[in-house]
């Protein structure tokens, strides 16, 4: 696990013990950090097969899924926190995904590169 400063910055925004959905979770590093340091639980969503395998290797719950399909597989308010970090710019329907983020999570944290 790297000691990346951005992991801790995001972790400080996530309440301890939260149920987290990490959209476009990559290799699962952030979710693994939240589990280890904030007592969180939850799922990552990732499309890339190599990253899904890396999540599994980290013992991160991951669903291989195309986010352009939306989040219909989750009920309203299923998660305390939904993370969408550097993901939005890769999606075709950004407005819909922001609506879905608000629907399934009580708190949404969204970032994108400048």
Name the predicted role of every residue range:
Residues 34-37, 100, 114:
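Glycosyltransferases and closely related glycan-assembly transferases
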């Amino acid at each position: 696990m790297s000691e990346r400063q951005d992991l801790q910055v995001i972790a400080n925004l996530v309440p301890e013990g939260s149920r987290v959905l990490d959209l476009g979770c990559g290799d699962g590093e952030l979710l693994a950090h939240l589990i280890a340091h904030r007592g969180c639980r939850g799922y990552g969503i990732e499309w890339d097969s190599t990253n899904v395998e890396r999540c599994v290797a980290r013992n991160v719950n991951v669903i291989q899924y195309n986010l352009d399909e939306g989040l219909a597989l989750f009920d309203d308010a299923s998660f305390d926190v939904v993370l969408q970090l550097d993901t939005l710019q890769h999606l075709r329907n950004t407005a819909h995904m922001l609506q879905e983020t608000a629907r399934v999570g009580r708190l949404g944290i969204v970032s994108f590169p400048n």
